[in-house]
């Protein structure tokens, strides 16, 4: 692999409907797109999913752009002709954390690599299926009745797994209402670190609900308190923000801190580390699913590819193109079928290309680099 040109775009898309989590209300998604060109005319695209403010982790749109432009782009050119994306990922391991910045380049390299091989990205990664199941992730509503109406809308579209964001005061009474209304649907909750061990009795009560999992109930950097909580409740804990690397996953599993892992490609630094995590965890009986970052079309394509790996066993936060945004920055758009399944394109790369007119419409700044 040899990179001849890099194009970086800072972009912004407004949500169709504001999305509320325990962190607050979000009305737009700021992100960046990285295009890598080789001398044969192939192009690979990756997305940097860091938000404009550091509410999910320490990275921001501006900070990640700095790392990409000042460190990752020069490293791409300095590397010359290298073997594959995994070589470059390990070659740039000297860059501490900044995983969302690194993920944007890693994903772009994987698409470029698979195009050079002439095969779909999911096959290049080692995927074992050509379709995935999507779930829907719902923000916090003002009342249980509003949540029930929202769930009904998405179930009518074919979704079978529903994830509801929760925070203190907007939790068990909401989920009881959901269970009463919809019976045995696949139901899970995501706390985004809104609770502490002082809330252990609440989580014991949640055992009665038969939840698929409780995602990241405690602190975002914790695996010790989660160990104590998991030992006290029947419902599986799924770790999200606590797992940034394969070593984090190993430690959490050895402690018994979780039974499931949400692997977000952006959070762990790209497709390489996601593949490593699912393999290590899966071989120990801890299965995974692909989480999302209210993703654009570029990020969604890579998420679809990684979700075909063998130890991804739960429905994924990979909705159709029309879930979050009015405009899709890639073509073709993605839609779920009546069974909440999404078919992956049998084309080199992710199978999606930038919709140039839409991309230009939503581009705030653009940079080009050549060696």
Outline where the language-model segments fall.
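Shared catalytic-loop signature of beta/alpha-barrel
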Residues: 221-238, 243-341
């Amino acid at each position: 692999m040899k990179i001849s040109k890099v194009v970086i775009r800072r972009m912004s898309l407004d949500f169709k409907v504001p999305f509320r989590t325990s962190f607050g209300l979000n009305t737009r998604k700021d992100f960046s797109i990285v295009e890598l060109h080789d001398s044969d005319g192939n192009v690979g695209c990756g997305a940097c999913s860091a938000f404009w403010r550091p509410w999910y982790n320490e990275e921001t749109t501006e900070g990640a752009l700095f790392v990409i432009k000042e460190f990752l782009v020069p490293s791409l050119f300095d590397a010359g002709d290298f073997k594959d994306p995994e070589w470059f990922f390990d070659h740039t391991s000297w860059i501490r954390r900044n995983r969302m910045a690194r993920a944007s380049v890693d994903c772009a390299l994987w698409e470029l690599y698979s195009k050079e091989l002439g095969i779909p990205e999911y096959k290049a990664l080692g995927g074992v299926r050509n379709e995935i199941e999507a779930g829907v992730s719902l923000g916090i509503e003002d009342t249980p009745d509003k949540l029930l109406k929202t769930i009904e809308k998405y179930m009518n579209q074919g979704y079978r797994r529903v994830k509801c964001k929760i925070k203190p005061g907007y939790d068990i009474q909401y989920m009881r209402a959901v269970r009463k209304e919809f019976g045995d649907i696949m139901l899970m909750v995501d706390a985004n670190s809104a609770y502490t061990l002082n809330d252990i009795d609440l989580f014991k009560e949640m055992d009665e609900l038969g939840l698929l999992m409780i995602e990241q109930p405690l602190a975002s950097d914790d695996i010790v308190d989660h160990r104590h909580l998991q030992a006290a409740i029947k419902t599986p804990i799924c770790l999200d923000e606590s797992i940034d690397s394969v070593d984090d996953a190993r430690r959490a599993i050895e402690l018994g801190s979780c039974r499931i892992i949400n692997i977000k490609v952006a959070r762990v630094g790209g497709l390489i580390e996601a593949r490593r995590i699912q393999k290590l965890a899966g071989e120990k009986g801890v299965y995974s699913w692909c989480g999302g970052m209210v993703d654009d079309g570029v990020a969604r394509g890579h998420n679809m590819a990684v979700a075909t790996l063998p130890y991804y066993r739960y429905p994924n936060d990979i909705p159709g193109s029309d879930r979050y945004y009015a405009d899709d920055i890639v073509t073709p758009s993605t839609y779920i079928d009546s069974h909440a399944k999404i078919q992956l394109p049998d084309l080199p790369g992710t199978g999606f290309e930038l919709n140039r007119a839409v991309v230009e419409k939503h581009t705030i700044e653009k940079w080009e680099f050549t060696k």
